[in-house]
Amino acid sequence: MKLKALIIEDNEQNMYMLSFLLEKNNYEVFQAFNGLDGIKAATNCLPDVILLDIQLPEMDGYQIARELRNRNDLNTIPIIAVTSHAMVGDREKVMASGANGYIEKPIDPDNFIQRMESHFPKELLQRRNQL
Amino acid sequence: MEDTKSTFAKRWHWFILLILIILSYYSTAKLGLIFAFEGTVASPVWMPAGIALAAILLAGYRVWPAIYIAAFLANLQGLIVSELPFHSILILSLITAMGNTLEALIGAGLISRFSNNPNPLETLKGTTLFIFFGALLAPLIAALVGSSSFCIFTNHWEIYDHLLLNWWFGDTLGILILAPIIINWNQYKFNEWNYLKFAELVGFIIVLGFTSYLIFFTIYNLIYLFIPVLLWSIFRFGKFETSVFVLIISGLALWSIMHHAINNALQQNESILVIQSFVGIVAITFLVLSSVIYERKKMQLSLYESLTKHRSLLENLPQKIFVKNSNLIFVSCNENFAKELNIQSSEIAGKTDYDFFPIDLAEKYRKEDSAFLASGKLLETEVCETRAGQTYWTQVVKVPIKDGNGSVIGIQGIFWDITKRKQAEELLRLNEEKYRFLFERNPVPLLIYDTETLKFRAVNEAFIKQYGFSMDEVLAMQLPDLYPEEEKEALVEVAQGLHGHAYAGEWHHIRKDGSVISIIATSHDLDYMERDARIAAVTDITDRKLAEMELERYHKHLENMVEERTAELEIAKERAESADQLKSAFLATMSHELRTPLNSIIGFTGMLLQELPGPLNEEQKKQLRMTQKSGRHLLSLINDILDLSKIEAGQLNLSTDRFKISEVIQNVIDLSKPFATSKNLLLTAEIEPDLPEITSDQFRVQQVIINLVNNALKFTEVGSVKVEALLQDKHLVVRVIDTGLGIEENQITKLFKPFIQIDSGIARKHEGTGLGLSISKKLMTMLGGSISVESELAKGSTFIIRLPLDNNY
């Protein structure tokens, strides 16, 4: 059984790239183009990992992360922020909002999966390795 | 005269007095009638006239009835022998007696009127009055009345002038001879007699008798022999004795005439006139002389009395005292005065100023004393003399010595040295002048006012100048007059509450021209001309007040300006802040917007090269790698530019982390390992064990080390890159050592400038933005550390960073 990854990203190219990369790396990918959809999708499919863009329409990544962390059913899912917000303090802001990891764009396909999985909790990493 | 009258009244009973007057008058009249001209009552010497005048003078006007009665009886007696009918004799006697009485009354009245001495014969003035009024004028009245009435009743007008003249002369002689004896006898002091005096008297009487006999009964021409005899009497005996002697001589003279007359009837009248003149002149001469002598004697006596009375007191006084008589001859002096003249006090009597002083000085003293005697008033003077260059002051007091009549008979002079007092006074005066000067010329306006009435007592010149009032105007004013209405009441209250030295506060004063000035005053109580007063110093603070107001205004203005400026700055600051925020937002947006397309470029090329979508031929791979490389270069360029911009805009915020440098270096090695491996270079780390954790910005420290390591790898073709970490001087030192090209010494300084890559020739060979070292240097500075380089061409370079263990940026 594949791990489920939810990607919340408004940029179609990025969405396509991450989806392609994750699928190629044996992930089941769910897509959401805004925050509300993302939270709905997370509620419905209960992903193993959430890749979260920060700059999003209507509801930004920080808000989504906080919302997710406030949900009892979802607060254990690792959230990895993938963002072009590479300014000083952005990382800290992201982590403070509840994210588990931070990968700045542009991503490097050579080590992206490795970096993402380095933020996984032990139990999830074991499951991933068993696959 | 009061005294004499009361003495009389005591001695004699009034009634006895009257009887005595009548008897004596009548008896002397009987005697006189013996010598009377035939058929008349006119006698060559009419003694009763003297008795009448003396009685009125001594006992007063009230005794006149006795005189009248006696005169009437005497006349009656005298006329009864005439051929006139009795009633005529009666009337004639009454009229003649009236003349006799009037004679005494008028004579005595006139003498008393002009002489204030009870005994007129004691002074020259009184004696003159006695002779003129009593002996010459008054008898004329009696003679006129008597002669005229006699001729009317008898009708013997042919003897009128002869009668008148004899009557007048007879009365005159009677008065001149008898009145002085009675008057002088009244005051005569018998106790002054002693044996010596009595012996002299006996001798004198013998001489007198012998002389009289010689003259009147033998050699008539020797009449001048009387002169020494009478002078003896005058000088050696008193007035009374002399009067008696005059009477004796007169009696002898008349008796001799009568004796001669019997022998030579033809010459009788003529001889009587001659002897009358002789007696009259002798009497007058000796009356005058004796009065003068008496006056002198009495004056001498008074002086002597006044001297002896205070003698001991005067002797002991420190003052110098002398007494001069009215002729300015010294009479006496005390020892101090004698010492001044270098003589004994006993030697002074009889001397004058001429005996002691140079003539001009003596002349001067004489003039002063004469003027003093003439004024008769007490004189106090201060005399200044200069002797041997020294100034001496003498206080001189001259007191007139007066006799019982108030006439000045001498000078009592008292003088003493007051030089010291004068010097003290002068000193005082100078002092006073000094302080007066201090007050009057004081540049501060000063005023003195009465504490009770608040009236001005004095003000100084500065005050007059300041306020414009004249001195007279000020002295008519009160303190509140200077103040505006609204301050007057408060001022009076304050003025009454001040004590001692006090600050009187801030007030307004109105000057004469109406202008108002602001003042402050300080005052002090003082005693001014024996009244409670207060001196106040006034300071005009009008200008200061104006300046204060101006300053206040300026201060306000400044405050406003500051407020305005602050507001402006606030706005500017807000603007700047918003510009900063704008810049931050711009940088963030740029960063974000540039990364998004790069994400696709780098991401997709990466994925294509992984051949995830499908297999690629070699040419495709080669081209995709080139694309990937360009994308990565572009990304690092963007990162560097953003970093530099942030640093220069002050937008780079540093975080404070506690970390181990070994971890950071391991991360760098891990990250750079693929690059080193690709160039076949050895990348190693050598970290001193037990390095302490440091406090700094971990991300930035790592960024700098990555930069240095990547640079080293970039410029090294063969060999190795080594990273060392060690502790040195409480600083963490990280060295990145390569075996690369090395850097020329003159290039080293340029290294850390932006967009510099050493040797533009190889620049193109080594890709990079040229910003790395510049950013690294700036970051190190921000972190409180430093970066430096050591290099040797062709051998390699060593980049060294030093970081404080505990950062406090």
State the predicted function of each range:
Chain A
Residues 9:
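Conserved acidic carboxylate
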Residues 15, 57, 75, 87, ...:
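The feature encodes the CheY-like receiver
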Residues 16-24:
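Charged docking surfaces used in two-component/phosphorelay signaling
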Residues 26-33, 41, 103:
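Short hydrophobic/Thr-rich beta-strand motif most characteristic of the beta2 strand and flanking loop
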Residues 53, 83:
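Active-site residues of response regulator receiver
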Residues 107-116, 128:
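C-terminal output helix
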